[in-house]
Amino acid sequence: MKEIKFTTNYEPVLSFSDWNFKTKYEERVGNNPGYIQIVHGEAKHLALFPRCNNPVAILGVYKKINVAPHARHAKGVNIPNVVQYDEYKFQKCPYHNKRANYIKEYVDETEEPQRQELYKIAKEHYDKVIYLLQKETGIYITLAMAETLAENYVVKRAYNYIDATLYNIPWYLIYSFSGFPLYHMIIRKNTAIYKHLLQCGFILKDSKIKGHVYVENNNGSLLTATNYRYVVDKNDNLNEWLDFSIIRPDELVTDTLLYIPVDRFSINVDSYYFSNLIHYQNWNSRQQVLDIAERYMKPCN
């Protein structure tokens, strides 16, 4: 693990790559005995892991080790008045699981009330969510699409999926949705989606939006995000993807609407980008997009 935080709130993280990590850690915890405990006869400097809100021990900062400084789950250790170790969250943590299980399983809302904070962040930073979704996928999100995604995010309670975090709000926004019609969808040129549409024989015409095209075909095809995946590699890096499918109506089934796959592909996404973006000071807000969030993303009861 390459970063830590200090509470269960959604807050800026402290990265081990920060040259002043030790000083910042000690300034933050002060003389709070909860963060420095004797565990099995050894002093442990503790914090929380942002992905699962479980206690972690800091390694390589206060005692030399053979690898770069990092954090590791502190199984069974509690930080008084901050957090209790949770085995269920540990089992679901990407840095324990190493791979996503692709199941849209819900967390019990009584167990993780901070999920309401996640929902609040999605609403307050919805223009950044849309911006990053566009940037990483190449899909131009119109205001109508932004409305549909906001409404679906609330209906599906996507903020309450087991793997949902502050980091992957943009990906869960589209992953929780059933799919958009490709007809007249606007796509940025030279992206993965653009290339796959060309390979599948879709007719793409230049859009009025610079550097983009739109899909001219109207055969009922959809673009749907089928999976959000992650793998933690041997260097402790979290690699993430969105899996997409292009599907079209099955012409052999006439009595109901069913689809068949035309193509499948994956797009790499960077979750760390969003956590940095929400703290960016010089952001130019898109008020129309924020107004959509205000209309559709009402306070949770």
Regions found by a protein language model. Give the residues of each.
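N-terminal cysteine/histidine-rich coordination modules
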Residues: 1-113
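Intrinsically disordered, low-complexity N-terminal extensions of nucleic-acid-metabolism proteins
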Residues: 1-8, 116-124, 232-238
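Residue-identity detector for threonine
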Residues: 7-8, 23, 38, 53, ...
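Helix N-terminus capping/helix-initiation residues
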Residues: 15-17, 138-142, 261-270
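Histidine (H) residue identity feature
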Residues: 40, 45, 70-73, 96, ...
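Domain-exit/linker segments immediately C-terminal to small folded modules
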Residues: 74-186
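Intrinsically disordered, low-complexity regulatory regions
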Residues: 147-301
